[in-house]
């Protein structure tokens, strides 16, 4: 594996994949300590990925699954805002929401809405799209 993929695929293989047949590739990687570098490697593509979801959403009449997936991607990507001294990973969507609201209390309502969309997306696609785009802009600005 290229060294440039160590913090994305290496981390993913070591901590999130289970071998079901053949060689266990996880054994080729050390345990990774939680870090911003890993968060960037795993979530750094959040804006183009979400733009892809929004494009697909505009082309379908039943986008409930896409809305749910987009909301989850965005909420998990808030891990990009972690501090260097953070020494663990959020495990649940609720933990992601709680952590980002602790750091950005002014986003409490927006993050609460996003968490709700992770479980039961609203039917109004135009409203969903507008709010998701606003949160995408906020995340993009907050991580600079």
Residue ranges, per PLM feature:
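Conserved nucleotidyltransferase catalytic core and NTase-mimicking acidic/glycine-rich helix/loop elements
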Residues: 30-144
